[in-house]
Amino acid sequence: MGFWAKSLRIFKCLCDHGTLSIRQLAQRTDVAKSSVHRLKQAMERRDIHPESWVWETEVGHQWLLRLIVATLYTFGLKRGVGLDTMSEFFTRLRLARQVGGSPSALRQVMQVLETALLETAGRWEKDGVAAGEVREIIGAVDETFLEQMILVFQDVRTGYIVQEEGADDRTYTTWKAVVEARLTALGAEVWYLVSDRAKALIQLAEQGLECLSMPDFFHCMHDLVKSYALTIGQRVRQAQHELTKAQETLARRHAPHSLDGSEREARAIVEARQGEVTRWEEVRTAYRDHLATLSLTLHPFRIADSAPQTSAQVANQLQATLEAITALAQRQQLPARYDAMTKVRKQVPALAALVDLWWQGVHQDVEPCVLSPRWRQWVDECLLPMVYWGHQVTRTRCRRRKATMQAAWAATRAAFDQHAITQRLTPDVLAEWQAWALQRTKAFQRTSSAVEGRNGYLSQMHHNQRGLPRRRYKVWTIVHNFDCRAADGTTPASRFFQRTFPDLFEAVLSQIEDLPQPRRRKHQVALTH
């Protein structure tokens, strides 16, 4: 029986029977007289605040345990708050006499918490793998640099971090060894891999995993923006500055009842400067329209009529838009960005290849159903575009592109509702079809933004805690996979393994039985801690 269990038994006995001698307490609680004496003295030392008696009860002690562990878990593990800060927090709550709240004592609890997390997540992952279903991963791979280089491999569709592993290098051999070992343990396969086009990552996809190497579309767009957006923006600001100067000159030369030559000249200059502003604003608008066209082109459906499109059609449209950007830059005599444009053009075939691969997955799913041409037309031209655009609307922040997608969704929704097959299906069957369509929609991933965001989170946490033991990295992975909840309440692990898991915090809380004992120190020292 531990320290706190004996204390709770003694306090309950005192509450039930009133004042008792040490001998009587020992007899009723089955605790040695010497222990009863020490524990009773400890209770008296803790009883210095009006609420102190609450923590001596079983309910109060359980709540105190939850408070300590929840603080360490939420603020320490998930937010990177230091132990010194949390120790001060517990002191402000007047808990220094109730429980060990020093940084060293909290560190012990944190270590127990980390061990419980590692063991719990290990069991749950084995349970998920034991289901025996071969999982199809849409991988995003990248590396981040903390105290050592960390290789990050994430399933983009579910958000599940497949692997976060420290490594000395990022060569193809290292990546292949790390990824293949993890895939074997999970019984999973990679459908395609999204990356920043590092040579080792391209080789990993095409040779190691034998899948499509998908360029990160965000990186492509970023390369285009770096090429011309800054230059065009500078021309707009320069033209606006010249217009402001011309207007100020005109205001100084303006006379109430005269129109001499100098004022006419100033007005002409203002009109010319206004023309330059209009010209460069139109150039900027045209450039942004081209960028929006690129973004709206790389989809399984045409944005204009939501008709299914192929990789060849997408590639032609992307190349045509890139040529339009180049022509715009040449007409406006902007600095040539040959290397950047060539880099983007070379990635167009791999970008467009995702469209045919996505349709291949769709056809593999519906092939066992042996659909008639009319049913296939309903799936390809009504159901899938309706669900796809509806999902993309929720993910798009740009107001212009969102409005365009909303218009496409509204049109497909109307066609879907009016179709004879839609009207004939029961609500349950229709819901199953829509759930399947949503899963296929989520399989179209153009960027590795999730893994980039993960890298930023790791860097921020590492900065907050001024470096961490390597063991903490695995704990962060577990917290992300099993306790990072989406709006619908699901976690990456529940989406990846397609099953529910208990609440991670409650699971580890049940494994922590005792809290550290408070220090025996003078009252004044405790107050000034």
Which residues are covered by each model-predicted region?
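RNase H-like polynucleotidyl transferase catalytic core
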Residues: 212-228, 431-444
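Short, amphipathic alpha-helical "recognition" segments used to contact nucleic acids or chromatin
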Residues: 2-20, 65-81
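Acidic/histidine-rich catalytic cores and adjacent linkers
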Residues: 6-8, 12, 17, 22, ...
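DNA major-groove recognition helix of helix-turn-helix
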Residues: 40-43, 110
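Short alpha-helical "recognition helix" segments of helix-turn-helix
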Residues: 24-29, 86
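RNase H-like nuclease fold core
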Residues: 52-194, 198-217, 224-328
